[in-house]
Amino acid sequence: MRTNPTTSPPGVSTIEEKSTGRIDQIIGPVLDVTFPPGKLPYIYNALVVQSRDTADKQINVTCEVQQLLGNNRVRAVAMSATDGLMRGMEVIDTGAPLSVPVGGATLGRIFNVLGEPVDNLGPVDSSATFPIHRSAPAFIELDTKLSIFETGIKVVDLLAPYRRGGKIGLFGGAGVGKTVLIMELINNIAKAHGGVSVFGGVGERTREGNDLYMEMKESGVINEKNIEESKVALVYGQMNEPPGARMRVGLTALTMAEYFRDVNKQDVLLFIDNIFRFVQAGSEVSALLGRMPSAVGYQPTLSTEMGSLQERIASTKKGSITSIQAVYVPADDLTDPAPATTFAHLDATTVLSRGLASKGIYPAVDPLDSTSTMLQPRIVGNEHYETAQRVKETLQRYKELQDIIAILGLDELSEEDRLTVARARKIERFLSQPFFVAEVFTGSPGKYVALAETIRGFQLILSGELDGLPEQAFYLVGNIDEASTKAITLEEENKSKK
């Protein structure tokens, strides 16, 4: 099999070197193309069909070579709709894989899978481009030091810390605050780490992509007045796109993130929403390419495809890519091959709870369901680990007592249990936090809380030093000193009412 070298030089070969073929067969988004003998393109080469349809409209379809069939024929998958294509149309081999613009020019802009801007803000400076198929970093380039990626969000940093260069699964239904959490992380990485973010919308609703863009403009994550000062690049391949585009849009976003890591030496946050749609698109393409399906109808190459994407997300000695991936679980079946393959790559899971959101506790991260492989004494230190374990134990005990409280009331509990409940309720409220990107909705200024401050705050609650403060004082504050100040303010307000 002729495969394209993954470190192929950027750009497209000269006109003289380009070979042309003709379309033989079209089955949905899959094209069979015949080339002259000895002029076959490599696997993953980009092919371009430029012609006019019967209504004399310009057709411009880019495809990617997937199989060499023999007899000088190749099978390619289209990255856009194949409407208007006919047998016999001319196909040009570009001589290189799909390449997309990278660098600062991508910030604040929306791209499609081909790296073309789709936001009507004019062309993008494409002097720097990278091919979307690239090798994962070599072993000697990897940074093996286990370090925490501080987000400034208390519940995440304390109970399910993110690994620098790790992969995090974000689980949550509609309306529990996934988008706001994503935007806050984008904002915090820019402020605290001087980093940038890339958002890959893979096979999700176009409306949601538009809403996210509008909210980012409103909150200042995308700076309309000075677009270069934006903190994020957006790449969309939504659910109305052909499977080829949905299968490759994740790689386009990852390629843009790799440039910031390798060339600009920055810490990058890569969001993929939704990683399941990447697998789903691969499954559709696999069937169209005539491969025998594997378990539950998925592609036989599921693990390989997932691995080739996930292994490129890593920390190197130059910088890091930390990835947060929304994971859809079909029919809530965690043993389904798609989520099961994803879980193998994750370092942490952040689970958003509808119950907490309904109580008004934001971020609505479930402190007991969210997990992280980083929460070990040798990585985070004994103080952090023991504080996190005691917080979880207190919340777990409160959860167990809730049924008794509902039936018999608080008065029937022992003195020790009543104290546990009081502290758990304070902890629950202290896990909430005002976000910078939510200032426009809440009116309260956002807070970035350093990890040391977070640990100190929870230690004070657990030690009983703050048992005298009302639980409302802990709601939507930053560090623990703000809770003490808020308690004094509340007390003064109550006195003035009397």
From Swiss-Prot:
Coiled coil: none annotated. Gene3D superfamilies: 2.40.10.170, Bovine Mitochondrial F1-atpase, Atp Synthase Beta Chain, Chain D, domain 3, P-loop containing nucleotide triphosphate hydrolases. ATP binds at residues 172-179. It catalyses: ATP + H2O + 4 H(+)(in) = ADP + phosphate + 5 H(+)(out). GO terms for cellular component: chloroplast thylakoid membrane; mitochondrion; proton-transporting ATP synthase complex. It is found in: Plastid, Chloroplast thylakoid membrane. The keyword Nucleotide-binding applies. One of its GO terms (biological process) is proton motive force-driven mitochondrial ATP synthesis. The keyword Acyltransferase does not apply. Its main location: plastid. It is a peripheral membrane protein. GO terms for molecular function: ATP binding; ATP hydrolysis activity; proton-transporting ATP synthase activity, rotational mechanism. Its EC number is 7.1.2.2. InterPro entries: AAA+_ATPase, ATP-synt_VA_C, ATP_synth_F1_bsu, ATPase_a/bsu_AS, ATPase_alpha/beta_chains, ATPase_F1/V1/A1_a/bsu_N, ATPase_F1/V1/A1_a/bsu_N_sf, ATPase_F1/V1/A1_a/bsu_nucl-bd. Keywords: ATP synthesis, ATP-binding, CF(1), Chloroplast, Hydrogen ion transport, Ion transport, Membrane, Nucleotide-binding, Plastid, Thylakoid, Translocase, Transport. PANTHER family: ATP SYNTHASE, ATP SYNTHASE SUBUNIT BETA, MITOCHONDRIAL. Produces ATP from ADP in the presence of a proton gradient across the membrane. The catalytic sites are hosted primarily by the beta subunits. F-type ATPases have 2 components, CF(1) - the catalytic core - and CF(0) - the membrane proton channel. CF(1) has five subunits: alpha(3), beta(3), gamma(1), delta(1), epsilon(1). CF(0) has four main subunits: a(1), b(1), b'(1) and c(9-12). Belongs to the ATPase alpha/beta chains family. This is ATP synthase subunit beta, chloroplastic.
